[in-house]
C-alpha cells in the first residue's frame, strides 16, 4: 500500500509540475494520454471466454512531453510515459512508474539523441508497417501477435535518429541490458540495433538489424553462458489514398541452444514471421483493416501459427473512436499464440488450440 501511495504522490507532483510549466513557459511541456477499453469474446477448444480488456487497439497511457529552446537551432527534449490498465486502474507492465518511455536528450539540425528507456529501430518499423486507423501495431495485426517484446524497447540505452537526407534517415540504439544487476551475466540483454528508413512520395521502406545478448538457461547467475541472437527486419508500404498496403518480414537467427521455448528473459528461438495488411478508407465513414500473417519456428514446424483479422475503426471525433473486429489464430500442435492486445496478452490458449476472438471497444485521447 505504501508503494502505491508513493507512486500516486509522484504522479500528482508531476501533473502539478506540468501545469505550472504550461503556465510559465507556454507550451513547452505537454500532458497527454490515451484510454482504451474493449469487450472481447474468445472461442477456443470448446470454451468461450468473455472479458473486459484495456489497451486492445491503443495502449492506455499518460505522459509528459517537453522541450526547451537552447538557441542556435538546439533544443533539450524529454519524454516520460506510463502505461496503465483502464479496466482495473493498475499500472501496466513491470510496475515501473514510467514503464513505456523515459528519456532526455538533445534535438538539432543533426537529428535527435536520447538517453534512457527507448524504443528500438525494430519497434519503429513495426509501428510504421503494421497498419491501423486508430492505432498501429494493435489488436488484429499479425505482427502484434508474433513480436518478441524484448526487441521492442530497451532500458539503459542511447538512441539516435538522424535528420532526413534525400528522403532517408538512420536510427541507432545501444543498450546495456543487465547493467550490472546482481545475479545475472554482465552482458545479458546488451542490445545493438541500426535501421534505415526511406520515403519517396507515397512509398516507404525500412531495413533494420538488431543483436541482443541472451542466456540459454532459465536459472541465471553471473557466470551463466551468454550468446548473441540476431534479428533482420524489412518493411514497406504504399499509400494510394483510399487504400494503403504494407508488408513486414522478420528473421531471427543464431539462437544457440534455444529450440522451442523461451528459457530466459532475452531468449527467443530461431524463427521467421511476416504480415501483409491493408487499410481501406471511407467504408461507411470509417476504415477497415485487413491483416494476414504467419509465424515459422525454424527448429520444429509444430510451433508454427497463422493469423487472420478484420477490424473496423470509426472516428466519433478527433479524439474519440470506436472499433469492432474479428480475428483468428490457428496454432500448430506446440504453438500457444493468441490474439494479443496492443499492450498486454490476449485470451490464453492451450498448445495446439485455435482461437477466434470478437472485439468491440472505445478509445479516447486527451
Label every PLM stretch briefly.
Residues 30-32, 75-77, 112-116, 169-171, ...:
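Residue-level detector of the transmembrane beta-barrel scaffold of outer-membrane proteins
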Residues 316, 350-366:
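Outer-membrane beta-barrel "beta-signal"
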Residues 47-51, 145, 180-182, 219-223, ...:
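Extracellular loop and loop/strand-boundary signature of outer-membrane beta-barrel proteins
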Residues 187, 193-314, 326-328:
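Detector for outer-membrane/organellar transmembrane beta-barrel domains
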Residues 1-25:
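Gram-negative bacterial Sec-dependent N-terminal signal peptides
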Residues 39-47, 84-90, 121-123, 178-182, ...:
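Gram-negative outer-membrane beta-barrel proteins
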Residues 26-42, 49-177, 188, 196-204:
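Outer membrane beta-barrel
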Residues 18-24, 62-70, 108-112, 162-166, ...:
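Outer-membrane beta-barrel proteins
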Amino acid at each position: 500500500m505504501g508503494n502505491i501511495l508513493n507512486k500516486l504522490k509522484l504522479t500528482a507532483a508531476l501533473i502539478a509540475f506540468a501545469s505550472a510549466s504550461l503556465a510559465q513557459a507556454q507550451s513547452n511541456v505537454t500532458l497527454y494520454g490515451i484510454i482504451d477499453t474493449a469487450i472481447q469474446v474468445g472461442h477456443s477448444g470448446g470454451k468461450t471466454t468473455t472479458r473486459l480488456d484495456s489497451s486492445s487497439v491503443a495502449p492506455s497511457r499518460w505522459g509528459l512531453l517537453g522541450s526547451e529552446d537552447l538557441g542556435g537551432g538546439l533544443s533539450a527534449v524529454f519524454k516520460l510515459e506510463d502505461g496503465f490498465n483502464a479496466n482495473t486502474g493498475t499500472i501496466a507492465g513491470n510496475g515501473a512508474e514510467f514503464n513505456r518511455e523515459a528519456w532526455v536528450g538533445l534535438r538539432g539540425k543533426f537529428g535527435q539523441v536520447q538517453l534512457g528507456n527507448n524504443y528500438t529501430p525494430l519497434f519503429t518499423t513495426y509501428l510504421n508497417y503494421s497498419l491501423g486507423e486508430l492505432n498501429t501495431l494493435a489488436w488484429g495485426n499479425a505482427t502484434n501477435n508474433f513480436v518478441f517484446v524484448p526487441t521492442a524497447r530497451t532500458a539503459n540505452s542511447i538512441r539516435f535518429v538522424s535528420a532526413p537526407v534525400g528522403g532517408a534517415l538512420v536510427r541507432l540504439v545501444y543498450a546495456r541490458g543487465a547493467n550490472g544487476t546482481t545475479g545475472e551475466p554482465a552482458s545479458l540483454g546488451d542490445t545493438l540495433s541500426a535501421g534505415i528508413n526511406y520515403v519517396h512520395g507515397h512509398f516507404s521502406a525500412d531495413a533494420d538489424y538488431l543483436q541482443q545478448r541472451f542466456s540459454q538457461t532459465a536459472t541465471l547467475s553471473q557466470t551463466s553462458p551468454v550468446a548473441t541472437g540476431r534479428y533482420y527486419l524489412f518493411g514497406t508500404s504504399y499509400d494510394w489514398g483510399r487504400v494503403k498496403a504494407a508488408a513486414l518480414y522478420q528473421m531471427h537467427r543464431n539462437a544457440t541452444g534455444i529450440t522451442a521455448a523461451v528459457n530466459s528473459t532475452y531468449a527467443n528461438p530461431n524463427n521467421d514471421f511476416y504480415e501483409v495488411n491493408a487499410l481501406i478508407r471511407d467504408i461507411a465513414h470509417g476504415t477497415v483493416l485487413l491483416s494476414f500473417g504467419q509465424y515459422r519456428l525454424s527448429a520444429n514446424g509444430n510451433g508454427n501459427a497463422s493469423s487472420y483479422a478484420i477490424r473496423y475503426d470509426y472516428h466519433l471525433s478527433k479524439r474519440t473512436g470506436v472499433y469492432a473486429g474479428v480475428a483468428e489464430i490457428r496454432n500448430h500442435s506446440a504453438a500457444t499464440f493468441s490474439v494479443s492486445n496492443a499492450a498486454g496478452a490476449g485470451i490464453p490458449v492451450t498448445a495446439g488450440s485455435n482461437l477466434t476472438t470478437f472485439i468491440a471497444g472505445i478509445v479516447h485521447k486527451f
